[in-house]
């Protein structure tokens, strides 16, 4: 027997729809206010979770009913997910919060085969969804005692800076030049049957990020969760899962000088990751998030093909926009470089895919055929074992890959493109 619980709230458009409002994504010029109606199906006798595994919400967009189906992203967090910050005296504080009953979902719109959704339900509905080929954002309005939410399109957000935002990677080499000696991919029979790649990601936010949020590290942690949830929407069709291994906030001071040169900052972060982070936190990729304004139009940089090399599985990202979707695409782009993908070129026939060299104002959240080919070539040539095995804490800089044969020595210049 199924008991259907309906939370009945009227569906309405805000009477002053179209006026300007300041939301988390910035100043929004055109929006409508809706009151979502939650529809939850519970099995009789089922244990009530704070956040159900599946949920449905109804509301209207432009007068048309929308039924939003949501499923909890159960692979968003690693089992040993951790959060780290520092006390005023510099003591490192690491906690391991329970993350099974979390509030991050992916989904679709009923009767819209091309629809997608990436939503958090932590405090109302917050995120984005694709409906009839157009992308909409939704977030709760901060009105006491109200269930009102704003729904708006990306083009209705006032742009703070029209300057094109670029990835700093310059293409001048082919990925097969990186490793001269191929090695064997040693997988168990079970891993061979289900060869789903898993990126165990640690996000490190520097002091400038903490200052930007006035010391509220929960805001940074939520930003990280939201970005990774959205990145999974991009990566799952590629057979790749992005799993949050941890997030670290430098609440007291930076552990190296964060410079306006993205290249120098990437070098420094990669060095710190080897000497510090990798010795205490299992992961196979790390991304550095900073509010530092990088030189020129650069907002990100990463080592191409560095994912399973202990020295170079890293990238740096500037917090360049208030729009969570664009930040997720930016970090997802740099992780793509770590996975061997280069920039989309004219022949890729996709101007707004994830690996486009510029941050597009209307990204598709898809990878081009070129990106798929680069990734498949990376898997074939590099045999990246770390993507198919849970990472272990290591004190070593490089790992033997076939018997006692070590990786051939690779310099920074080999990876920096």
Curated annotation (Swiss-Prot):
**Location in the cell:** Secreted
Quote the tissue specificity entry.
Expressed by the venom gland.
Answer yes or no on keyword Thylakoid: no
Listed Pfam families: Pep_M12B_propep, Reprolysin
Q: Give the chief site where it resides.
A: secreted
What are the transmembrane regions? none
Q: Which cysteine pairs are joined by S-S bonds?
A: 308-386, 348-370, 350-353
Tell me which EC number(s) this protein carries: 3.4.24.-
Q: Which residues form the propeptide?
A: 21-189, 392-417
List positions binding Zn(2+). Answer: 333, 337, 343
Give the molecular function GO annotations. Answer: metal ion binding; metalloendopeptidase activity; peptidase activity; toxin activity
| Domain of life from the UniProt record | Eukaryota
Stretches assigned to the Peptidase M12B domain: 197-391
What is the enzyme's main class?
A: hydrolase
What GO cellular-component annotations does this UniProt entry give? extracellular region; plasma membrane
Specify the signal sequence span.
Answer: 1-20
Q: How does it assemble?
A: Monomer.
The protein's job, in short, is: Snake venom zinc metalloprotease that inhibits platelet aggregation by binding specifically to platelet glycoprotein VI (GP6) and platelet glycoprotein Ib alpha (GP1BA). It inhibits the interaction between collagen and platelet GP6 by cleaving GP6 (at '225-Glu-|-Ala-226' and '238-Val-|-Phe-239' bonds), and inhibits vWF-induced platelet aggregation by cleaving GP1BA and vWF. Cleavage of GP1BA occurs at two distinct sites to generate two soluble fragments. It also cleaves alpha- (FGA) and subsequently the gamma-chain (FGG) of fibrinogen, leaving the beta-chain unaffected.
Q: What is this protein called?
A: Snake venom metalloproteinase kistomin
């Amino acid at each position: 027997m199924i008991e259907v619980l309906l939370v009945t709230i009227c569906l309405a458009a805000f009477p002053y729809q179209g006026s300007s409002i300041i939301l988390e994504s910035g100043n929004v010029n055109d929006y409508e206010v809706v009151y979502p109606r939650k529809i939850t199906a519970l099995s009789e006798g089922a244990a009530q979770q704070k956040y159900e595994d599946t949920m449905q919400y109804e509301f209207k967009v432009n007068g048309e009913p929308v039924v939003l189906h949501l499923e909890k992203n159960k692979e968003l967090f690693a089992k040993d997910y951790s959060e780290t910050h520092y006390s005023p005296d510099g003591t490192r504080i690491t906690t391991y919060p329970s993350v099974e009953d979390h509030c991050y979902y992916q989904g679709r719109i009923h009767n819209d085969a091309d629809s997608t959704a990436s939503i958090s339900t932590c405090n109302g509905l917050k995120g984005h969804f694709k409906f009839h080929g157009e992308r909409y954002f939704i977030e709760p309005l901060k009105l006491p005692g109200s269930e009102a939410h704003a729904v708006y399109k990306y083009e209705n957000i006032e742009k703070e800076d029209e300057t094109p935002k670029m990835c700093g990677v310059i293409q001048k080499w082919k990925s097969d030049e990186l490793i001269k000696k191929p090695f064997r991919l040693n997988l168990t029979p079970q891993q061979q049957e289900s060869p789903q790649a898993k990126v165990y990601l640690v996000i490190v936010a520097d002091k400038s990020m903490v200052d930007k949020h006035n010391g509220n590290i929960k805001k940074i942690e939520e930003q990280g969760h939201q970005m990774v949830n959205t990145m999974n929407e991009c990566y799952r069709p590629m057979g790749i899962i992005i799993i949050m291994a941890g997030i670290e906030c430098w609440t007291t001071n930076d552990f190296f000088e964060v410079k306006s040169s993205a290249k120098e900052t990437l070098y420094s972060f990669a060095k710190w990751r080897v000497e510090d982070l990798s010795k205490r936190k299992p992961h196979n990729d790390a991304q550095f998030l900073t509010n530092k304004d990088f030189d020129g139009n650069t907002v990100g940089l990463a080592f191409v093909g560095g994912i399973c090399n202990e020295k170079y599985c890293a990238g740096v990202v500037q917090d360049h926009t208030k729009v969570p979707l664009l930040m997720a695409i930016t970090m997802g782009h740099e992780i793509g470089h770590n996975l061997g993908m280069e920039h989309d070129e004219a022949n890729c026939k996709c101007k707004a895919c994830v690996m486009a060299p510029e941050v597009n104002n209307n990204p598709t959240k898809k990878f081009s055929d070129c990106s798929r080919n680069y990734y498949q070539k990376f898997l074939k040539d590099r045999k990246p074992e770390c993507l198919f095995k849970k990472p272990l804490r290591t004190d070593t800089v490089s790992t033997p890959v076939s018997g006692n044969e070590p990786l051939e020595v690779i310099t920074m210049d080999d990876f920096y493109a």
